[in-house]
Amino acid sequence: MKLTCVIVAVLFLTAWTFVTADDSGNGLENLFSKAHHEMKNPKDSKLNKRCLDGGEICGILFPSCCSGWCIVLVCA
């Protein structure tokens, strides 16, 4: 009986922590809206992107920069 009460109390406090947690950045809301946008516009999805933008780290032997230039391990 005591163990059951402890388990219920722990579950309640855990749920209460998640419910009352302050999400000032609206992280989940932004995540879901972004995912919905990518479903509506598949061209905007990062999974379809095959090259790296300027300023991103690249490899010397196999550069995958959109511009085709990999200078000092950074896409130009």
From Swiss-Prot:
The presence of a 'disulfide through disulfide knot' structurally defines this protein as a knottin. The cysteine framework is VI/VII (C-C-CC-C-C). GO terms for cellular component: extracellular region. Disulfide bonds join 51-66, 58-70, 65-75. Pfam families: Conotoxin. Belongs to the conotoxin O1 superfamily. This is Conotoxin MaIr332. Its main location: secreted. It comes from Conus marmoreus (Marble cone). Residues 22-48 form a propeptide. Residues 1-21 form the signal peptide. Expressed by the venom duct.
